[in-house]
Design a protein with these regions (language model features):
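Thiol/disulfide oxidoreductase modules built on the thioredoxin-like
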Residues: 285-287, 294-340
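Oxidative protein folding and maturation machinery
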Residues: 1-219, 223
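Active-site acidic short loop of glycosyltransferases
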Residues: 229-231, 261, 287, 306
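Alpha/beta-hydrolase fold active-site loops
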Residues: 232-233, 310
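Conserved redox-active cysteine motifs that mediate thiol-disulfide chemistry
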Residues: 229-230, 236-254
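Extracytoplasmic/secreted envelope proteins and their assembly/folding machinery
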Residues: 65, 275, 279, 331, ...
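Conserved hydrophobic packing residues within short motifs/helices of P-loop NTPase cores
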Residues: 235, 267-269, 313
Length: 344
């Protein structure tokens, strides 16, 4: 239904709500640098023309022009990862043509954080330049210390990254990142929120007793975690609808075959809300290990702070946590970890 805003800011609001802003398509990253830059510039110029045609107040257009810069070039930083992906390249190093343009548009100015578009844009710009295939936290901290002098921008990126990493994967190996957070983030609300999630993960450190579960196998039998003591337990929290979960299944099968007869229980814990979907998948007969249905409303998932799947958990023979966020079956270091444990 067509509608119009009224009142003192009607012109601005109608412009923001109704304007068909230009955006750059993901596939544009397949273009070579010179053409990608031209396409990005064209999007920005089209949005500027749209703004100028709207007869907006002068005090608004100055800010809007800056907002449109970040909105129009939103995909520009991701070119470094999207381009080699779309072109199926083993490696890609951007030329000075691209990097100079990135420096031109990626303004480091904390005052720009008033625009939602800037926060996402500058974070992606920093991530794409910082991450080089090693330890991401170390790479990011080193890059920001060398290149980001604006305290507001540094705090914004540090908070967003550190909170996401700790809330999703815990405290293991995060001491340096946590210290970096407290050095660069001073907003009491952000610090309190971060400290709370750190405290939640304290109970999931290595050596802590694992939260328990009782789940149902395909025959309706109840199986508890305590019944699995005596062997290491490698748990896969998954669901039939989860693409990344399904992607790990072939690797899990290989692991189970490689360590058959060893002191490791391989446990699949389904969090499917639709139990029949899980039953149909298990009845295919190609999934090994101990397959159980846990469901969505589980204390186990809440206590392990699981907010995304798949999630892998590794426990020792006494039911104590080794890793609350263990490597996936597809990661090479999982076999090294198993081998080290089995030598003990």
């Amino acid at each position: 239904r067509e509608f119009n805003c009224t009142g003192a800011a009607a012109t601005i609001n109608n412009y923001l709500i109704k304007s068909p802003f230009a955006v750059l398509d993901f596939n544009a990253a397949a273009k070579e640098e010179v053409d990608f830059i031209k396409s990005s510039d064209s999007v920005y110029n089209a949005n500027l023309a749209l703004m100028k045609s709207a007869n907006l107040p002068a005090n608004f257009t100055k800010k809007e022009q800056q907002r449109l810069l970040f909105k129009s070039y939103a995909m520009f930083p991701m070119y470094m990862s999207y381009h080699p992906y779309l072109k199926k390249m083993d490696s890609y190093t951007p030329t000075a043509l691209y990097t100079n343009k990135l420096k031109e548009v990626a303004i480091i100015d904390g005052n720009c954080l008033e625009y939602a578009e800037y926060g996402d844009f500058i974070m992606n710009a920093v991530f794409c330049q910082a991450f080089q295939g090693g330890d991401r936290s170390k790479e990011l901290m080193a890059f920001m210390d060398a290149n980001i002098k604006d305290a507001k921008v540094k705090s914004y990126i540090t908070n967003a990254y550190a909170y996401d990493v700790v809330s999703s994967s815990g405290l293991d190996g995060k001491d340096e990142l946590i210290a970096y957070f407290h050095k660069n983030v001073s907003d009491p609300k952000l610090v309190d929120k971060f400290d709370k999630v750190c405290k939640q993960w304290e109970g999931l450190k290595a050596g802590c007793i694992s939260p328990s579960f009782t789940a149902t196998d395909i025959n309706g039998k109840q199986v508890s975690l305590s019944s699995l003591k005596g062997k290491y337990v490698y748990i896969d929290v998954w669901a039939t609808w989860c693409g990344p979960c399904r992607g790990e299944l072939p690797y899990m099968t290989k692991l189970e075959e490689q360590y058959a007869g060893k002191d490791i229980h391989f446990v699949g814990l389904s969090c499917d809300s639709n139990k029949s979907a899980w039953e149909k998948r298990i009845q295919k007969g190609d999934m090994k290990g101990i397959q159980l249905h846990l469901g969505t409303k589980s204390d186990f998932m809440q206590k392990y702070l699981i907010n995304g799947i798949p999630r892998f958990i590794l426990l020792d023979c006494e039911g104590k946590i080794i890793k609350a966020d263990a490597p996936r079956p597809s990661e090479p270091n999982i076999t090294k970890l198993f081998d080290e444990l089995l030598k003990k």
